[in-house]
């Protein structure tokens, strides 16, 4: 009882501190509502220099949170894209900030029109555990480029990374500019209730609904980067080694704990055995052993490991054939496993997998594969393997997904010049590059008239002049 009271008191204290922090950031924004390009570039360069200097410490912190996280995967999937994204924005922010001239109709002349891009104010970012660095720095980059103040809520599942990032960012930003927030679920709930000018959430669809509901109380606009079951479609003619190798990379990275990882693969029925053989050969080439392999990342915690084992048990009990590619390794290293003969009533086909399990589903014709995808919630990503241009266009035009890779996996997320975001149940809104700048800016339309006022002819009292001139010229 005493422990419960102490916990509640601590929790309330953290929430009070959170609200006070938000108030300080709002006051700081009001004191400097339009930072110039020089200031924004300085922020971005300081962030880039910090990440570059502290990359080893970040690698070690993320490794501690996972108990075993491939250092190369952290470099490839977190540090490198973060650095590139910052560099990309810093080079272009001055151009992005320039007011955009717009056309004015003849009936409103003389006049001018433009769009001015203004910082929103205080931006909230809620970060998941699977890529704690990239999914905090990516939104931070866009928000800073747009001139905002930023509060970042780190996941309670990555405490080492959260503490380190809080310490590092405090070295280069005052707390009323950028602040990292730590805490358990109750702090996260309170965070989503703050009256941010924009809130970006990355995580599960089920949690995203709660975040959006909380934000709606303040009419806070949200960007939701969710997930779903992202399909890979293998065509009838693509060289199977090409498809198997690239799908295996997408499923192996971070042990499949990636929101855009291939969730299941659709393969022509006559080529299923070929796919299984090639996939097994590729994965075992990637990872000659599982235990103590520094290249193979662990499942983040026991709860997630238990969830994935539960999927395997459920599928086995309902008639699926399991093809594990290794024996289970130490430190929560769960082997890649192919699942054949799956059915829609299995949990592995009902929920986002978020791990190294890959159902293989046969199809007869391309239209059957597209129908299978379209009967399900719209995914965050879709992958198609086939070099026929007409078939590629058919897949693009006849399916909906947040993004697409043709003949590869994951890499669309690393492109700074294309937007990243979901559609429907997989999310809403976009960020990365210019789209990130736009998401975190208010595009303010500005109409300007000179002293001469031709608009007097449409002022009341209405008479013959408006009938003869205005209506005759413009109502047609």
Curated annotation (Swiss-Prot):
Instruction: Cite the active-site annotation.
Output: 225, 259
One cellular component GO annotation, for this chain's record?
Answer: cytoplasm
Report the EC code(s) recorded for this entry: 1.2.1.68
PROSITE patterns in the record:
ALDEHYDE_DEHYDR_GLU (PS00687)
Q: What domain of life does the UniProt record list for this protein's source?
A: Bacteria
Show the InterPro entries listed in the entry.
Ald_DH/histidinol_DH, Ald_DH_C, Ald_DH_CS_GLU, Ald_DH_N, Aldehyde_DH_dom, Aldehyde_DH_NAD(P)
| PANTHER family given in the database record | ALDEHYDE DEHYDROGENASE, ALDEHYDE DEHYDROGENASE ALDX-RELATED
Family, similarity comment:
Belongs to the aldehyde dehydrogenase family.
Instruction: List the protein's name.
Output: Probable coniferyl aldehyde dehydrogenase
Native species: Pseudomonas aeruginosa (strain ATCC 15692 / DSM 22644 / CIP 104116 / JCM 14847 / LMG 12228 / 1C / PRS 101 / PAO1)
Name the gene: calB
């Amino acid at each position: 009882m005493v422990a419960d009271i102490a916990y509640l008191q601590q929790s309330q204290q953290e929430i009070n501190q959170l609200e006070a922090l938000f108030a300080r950031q709002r006051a700081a924004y009001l004191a400097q509502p339009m930072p110039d390009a020089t200031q924004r570039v300085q922020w971005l360069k300081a962030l880039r220099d910090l990440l570059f200097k502290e990359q080893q410490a970040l690698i070690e912190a993320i490794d501690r949170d996972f108990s075993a996280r491939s250092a190369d995967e952290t470099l490839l999937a977190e540090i490198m894209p973060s650095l590139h994204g910052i560099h990309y924005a810093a080079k272009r922010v001055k151009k992005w900030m320039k007011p955009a001239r717009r056309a004015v109709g003849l009936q409103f002349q003389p006049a001018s029109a433009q769009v001015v891009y203004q910082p929103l104010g205080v931006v909230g970012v809620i970060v998941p555990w699977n890529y704690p660095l990239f999914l905090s720095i990516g939104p931070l980059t866009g928000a800073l480029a747009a001139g905002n103040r930023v509060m970042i809520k780190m996941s309670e599942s990555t405490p080492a990374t959260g503490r380190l990032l809080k310490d590092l960012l405090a070295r280069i930003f005052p707390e009323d500019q950028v602040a990292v927030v730590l805490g358990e679920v109750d702090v996260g709930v309170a965070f989503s209730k703050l009256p941010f000018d924009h809130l970006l959430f990355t995580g599960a669809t089920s949690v995203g609904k709660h975040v959006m509901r909380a934000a709606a109380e303040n009419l806070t606009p949200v960007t939701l980067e969710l997930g779903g079951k992202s399909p890979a479609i293998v065509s009838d003619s693509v060289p199977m080694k090409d498809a198997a190798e690239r799908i295996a990379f997408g499923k192996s990275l971070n042990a499949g704990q990636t929101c855009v990882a291939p969730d299941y693969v659709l393969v022509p029925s006559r080529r299923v055995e070929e796919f299984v053989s090639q996939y097994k050969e590729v994965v075992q080439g990637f990872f000659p052993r599982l235990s103590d392999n520094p290249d193979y990342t662990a499942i983040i915690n026991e709860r997630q490991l238990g969830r994935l084992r539960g999927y395997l048990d459920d599928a086995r009990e309902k008639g699926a054939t399991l093809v594990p590619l290794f024996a289970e390794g130490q430190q929560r290293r769960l082997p890649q496993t192919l699942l054949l003969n799956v059915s829609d009533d299995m949990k592995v086909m009902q929920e986002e997998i978020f791990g190294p399990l890959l159902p293989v589903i046969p199809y007869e014709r391309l239209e059957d594969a597209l129908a299978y995808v379209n009967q399900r919630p719209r995914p965050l990503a879709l992958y198609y393997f086939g070099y026929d241009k007409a078939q590629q266009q058919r897949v693009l035009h006849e399916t909906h997904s947040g993004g697409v890779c043709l003949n590869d996996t994951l890499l669309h997320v690393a492109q700074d010049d294309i937007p990243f975001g979901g559609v429907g149940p997989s999310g809403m809104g976009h960020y990365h590059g210019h789209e990130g700048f736009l998401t975190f800016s208010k595009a303010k339309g500005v109409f300007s008239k000179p002293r001469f006022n031709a608009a007097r002819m449409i002022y009341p009292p209405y008479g013959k002049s408006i009938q003869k001139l205005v209506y005759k010229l413009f109502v047609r």
